[in-house]
Curated annotation (Swiss-Prot):
One Gene Ontology term, aspect cellular component: large ribosomal subunit
InterPro entries, sorted: Ribosomal_uL10, Ribosomal_uL10-like_sf, Ribosomal_uL10_bac, Ribosomal_uL10_bac_type, Ribosomal_uL10_CS_bac
General function of this protein: Forms part of the ribosomal stalk, playing a central role in the interaction of the ribosome with GTP-bound translation factors.
Recorded family membership: Belongs to the universal ribosomal protein uL10 family.
Taxonomic superkingdom: Bacteria
Alphabetical keyword list: Ribonucleoprotein, Ribosomal protein, RNA-binding, rRNA-binding
Entries under HAMAP family matching the protein: Ribosomal_uL10
Subunit structure: Part of the ribosomal stalk of the 50S ribosomal subunit. The N-terminus interacts with L11 and the large rRNA to form the base of the stalk. The C-terminus forms an elongated spine to which L12 dimers bind in a sequential fashion forming a multimeric L10(L12)X complex.
Protein name according to UniProt: Large ribosomal subunit protein uL10
GO term, biological process aspect, one: translation
Gene Ontology molecular function, alphabetical: large ribosomal subunit rRNA binding; structural constituent of ribosome
Length: 167
């Protein structure tokens, strides 16, 4: 079905609006994936706060012009499924990576984060970013370990000092 000019403008506006508020983006090729699996992927994307859409490459190129995702233009070849992470930078990459494990025909083309292009082979960099809660938990664990270690060292120094005074 051919799209009219107004439809194309609406698609470009919708995708560029999604790109403006996004933290990261990932592009993939979903040729050969069944409709049922794609529906499940779309549902998972909604739950994860990821905007996902299949868009014509020319329209997608126009939509990302002037955004942090302009560096992805070279991967917009063939059918392109684009996903923008709105809540967490690694959400779309994690979602696509998990989906690709169970679907041989699904292939990740690449991603972008803060204006930097991430090739498909390195998408794990983006997928393994900790969530805000995970990062805070790691920080707190590190702080607790550091303070416990400091306490142990202080107590050991105090013990050594008392032993030196007693001798």
């Amino acid at each position: 079905m051919a799209l009219g000019l107004e439809d194309k403008k609406a698609i470009v506006a919708e995708v560029s609006e999604a790109a403006k508020g996004a933290l990261s983006a990932v592009a993939a090729d979903s040729r050969g994936v069944t409709v049922a699996k794609m529906t499940a992927l779309r549902q998972s994307a909604r739950e994860a706060g990821v905007y996902m859409r299949v868009v014509r490459n020319t329209l997608l190129t126009r939509a990302v012009e002037g955004s942090d995702f302009e560096c992805m233009k070279d991967v917009f070849v063939g059918p392109t499924l684009i996903a923008f992470s709105n809540e967490h930078p690694g959400a779309a990459a994690r979602l696509f990576k998990e989906f690709a494990k169970g679907n041989d025909k699904f292939s990740i083309k690449g991603g972008a984060f803060q204006g930097e292009f991430i090739p498909a082979a390195q998408i794990d960099r983006l997928a393994t970013l900790p969530t805000y809660e995970e990062a805070i938990a790691k920080l707190m664990a590190t702080m607790k370990e550091a303070s416990a270690g400091k306490l142990v060292r202080t107590l050991a120094a105090l013990r050594d000092k008392k032993e030196a005074e007693a001798a």
